[in-house]
Each structure stands twice: as C-alpha cells, then as structure tokens.
Amino acid sequence: VIIEGLKEKYVSDETQLYLKNGMQAFENEDYMATAMYLLALLDNRVNKLVDFPNQRMSYRVKYSNDGFANQKAEDFRQLTEKRGIMSKKIYFLEMYPSLIAYLNRIFIDGLYKFENGIEPPYLNRNWLMHGRMNRNIERYECIQILNALSVIEFMFGDR
C-alpha cells in the first residue's frame, strides 16, 4: 500500500527515477543501494514540502521543533478550522514528534561523528553517503525510510 501510494505521488522524472531504482534494489535485496536512493528522495521531498523558516539552516536546526515551526503553526491553524481536536492530537502528539526524531537520527550525526570513529548502531545518511558504514543495512531500515516518505506525503503532500 505504501509503495503504491508513493508511485501515485511521484510523477516528476527525478522522484520516479529514485523510487524506481530504490525499489529495484530493494527487490534484489541490495539494501545499501536502496537506502542511498530512498534517503536522497527523502531529503528531496522534505525540502520541497516543508515550509522551513530558512532553507539554508543546518540539519540540526532544520530537523527540530524550530525548523518545523512555520509548518506546525500552519497545520495547527488548518486543523483547528477544518478537523478538530483529535486530528490535532494525532499530528502534534504523535506524528510530528516521531517524524522529527526519525529525521534527526537519519540526518544528524549526534554522538556518532566521523572523527570519533564510532559508527552509529542505526542508519545515518552521513555515514552511508560518505562511505563510512561498516555494516550491512537491514531490510527493516529501508522499510522505515519508505514509511517516513509515506508520512511526509500524508502530512505535507496535498498542499
């Protein structure tokens, strides 16, 4: 269901290409290639869909409550006008915190900087894209990226 929904959303050449290549690698159980394609797509979609106060923010600021401040304010306004309290609870108590936490883990090095030489025990874009990962990427990690893409499209894609 998630993949079909993403195929319907991704109609531009670059989004189709990255999703197609990512899914081909996924079917071939090449999870490292899958993660590379899907993380590039995730970065692209977040930057296109989210109203960041400043597109040139560091990842640490961008993928925080401060970075999502404009988007959250607009969602709060729209949900108040159109949907009600349950939708606000789902968005602000569940979806936003989970999405921001996942994006932080994927895009921000935190304690696991290259110079420390300790690889994170989870998928991190910098370690992967800079050729520093020394472990296999698991299938479930690629499914997590697909889930994040689906959540982003659900939350921000129809604006």
Predicted segment positions?
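Charged alpha-helical initiation segments
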Residues: 1-32
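Amphipathic, oligomerization/interface secondary-structure segments
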Residues: 32-159
